[in-house]
UniProtKB/Swiss-Prot annotation:
Disulfide bonds: none annotated. One of its GO terms (molecular function) is signaling adaptor activity. The keyword Lipid metabolism does not apply. The gene is rad9. Belongs to the rad9 family. One of its GO terms (cellular component) is chromosome, telomeric repeat region. It comes from Schizosaccharomyces pombe (strain 972 / ATCC 24843) (Fission yeast). Acts in DNA repair and mutagenesis. Involved in promoting resistance to ionizing radiation and UV light, as well as regulating cell cycle progression after irradiation. Repressor of entry into mitosis that is activated by chromosome breaks. Keywords: DNA damage. This is DNA repair protein rad9. Residues 402-426 are annotated as: Disordered. One of its GO terms (biological process) is telomere maintenance.
């Protein structure tokens, strides 16, 4: 079993792992004969993300796994789990070298010469394989010029995967916008800001954050701080929203989705119904959507929004892009194609209490039904078994600098209630 990624796609692969690391310190791999799905679920189980790499994304895709790893009857699938930090370190190492070459071309029309730069990439591709037996490793093998091969082995464990189920038929509010615009706007919010509110108002969309905590027990913020940025309705490629329906979600996961969409050069689509129901963020890259990404995030319900209706307020909509372009993301979105809960799925909703207890208890019931006990990630003292944990913002920024500035991966191609639904795979 072997998957080969060309140097053209290495940058995208690195960015995928970088942004997934903002959500959790581990990722799940779900591999079948047609695609690889990389998923993760945050610690509070209020945010789920999945990136799908289609077969066309790879230069070579050979799916001949050891029968020990296979699960599922209809579609044989491999399900494994790896820590994300070792993967980041693989791509962060200085294993790429570029030799700039200046090419001068004399112009035929007499206007002088034109200079262009070319970069000679030493790493030609990376081969990804999975070993079984006494050494359970996922292997990254970088093939370089002059016959140099760099090999990195990362431990994995077999796992059961959870998939979020999103009912798109209940999403009366949706929009599509250039991800670069959203990324620029989210930079106005501090890194320690936890929540973001999306509110349509008079053919504009307001993004609001509210900070009232003191930083590091110092009296830096003596007064609460509210930051609001406004997006003109004309900035959207497509929009259909009900005024009066605002949703509040985690800024960290929202920012991870926006940064990844901007890095891939894709517009981002959002779908949601009412506060308390999940919001879906989705985008794709490639002519045939070789890369697809979906982020499903829980939203918060305030005390004054318990009776809100999805149809309240004025509704405004417009489109500056052909409907076929907008709908292509929907057709290629395997996650949101589920209209109703499939058999064996579990949906839940809490009262205004402890959200983490709700998510844990719901998934624990699912595991007990299937006879599966989720492995513990803490010791008896309650300390994490993973020493480093999730990368902090400075580590991620350093990695992004390696990817963007050093160009080491080759050229780039153009209180409260929560609601969530997860289905247990066979």
């Amino acid at each position: 079993m072997e998957f080969t990624v060309s140097n053209v796609n290495l940058r995208d692969l690195a960015r995928i792992f970088t942004n997934l690391s903002r959500i959790d310190d581990a990722v799940n791999w779900e591999i079948n004969k047609n695609q690889i799905e990389i998923t993760c679920l945050n610690s509070s189980r209020s945010g789920f993300s999945m990136v799908t790499l289609k077969k066309a994304f790879f230069d070579k895709y050979i799916f001949q796994p050891d029968s020990v790893l296979l699960t599922g009857l209809m579609t044989p699938t491999i399900r494994i789990r790896t820590q994300v930090k070792p993967i980041l370190s693989v791509f962060r190492n200085k294993i790429f070298d570029f030799i700039p070459t200046v090419v001068t071309t004399n112009s035929k029309n007499g206007y002088g010469s034109e200079s262009a730069s070319r970069k000679d990439v030493i790493v030609e591709n990376v081969q990804i394989s999975i070993s079984t037996g006494s050494e359970c490793r996922i292997i990254f093998k970088f093939l370089c010029k002059h016959g140099v091969i760099k090999t990195y082995k990362i431990s994995y464990e077999q796992t059961q995967t959870l998939h979020a189920v999103f009912d798109k038929s209940l999403s009366h509010n949706n929009f599509q916008i250039n991800s670069k615009i959203l990324k620029d706007l989210t930079e106005h919010f501090g890194q320690r800001t936890e929540e973001l509110t999306i509110q349509p108002l008079q053919e504009r969309v307001l993004l609001t954050s509210f900070t009232e905590e003191v930083v590091h027990n110092r009296d830096i913020l003596k007064q609460p701080t509210q930051t609001t940025v406004s997006i003109d309705g004309k900035e959207f490629e497509r929009v259909a929203l009900n005024e009066g329906v605002s949703v509040t979600l985690s800024l960290r996961e929202f920012r991870a989705a926006v940064i990844l969409a901007e890095a891939l050069g894709s517009s981002i689509c959002a779908y949601y119904g009412v506060p308390g129901k999940p919001i879906l963020l989705t985008f794709a890259k490639g002519k045939n959507s070789e890369i697809e990404a979906q982020f499903i995030l829980a939203t918060v319900v305030g005390s004054d929004e318990q009776e809100v209706s999805s149809m309240m307020g004025n509704r405004w909509q417009h489109s500056s892009t052909p409907a076929s372009l907008f709908n292509s993301v929907e057709r290629n979105n395997s996650l949101t194609a589920v209209a109703h809960n499939p058999p064996g799925s579990i949906g839940w909703q809490t009262d205004q209490s402890d959200s983490s207890r709700m998510f844990n208890s719901a998934l624990d019931r699912s595991d007990e039904t299937n006879g599966i006990k989720e492995p513990s990630t803490t010791n008896d003292a309650g300390q994490s078994l993973f020493l480093d944990g999730i990368p902090n913002e400075s580590e991620l920024a350093a990695f992004n600098n390696d990817v963007n500035d050093d160009a080491e991966f080759g050229p780039t191609q153009a209180e409260q209630s929560y609601h969530g639904i997860f289905s247990q795979e066979d």
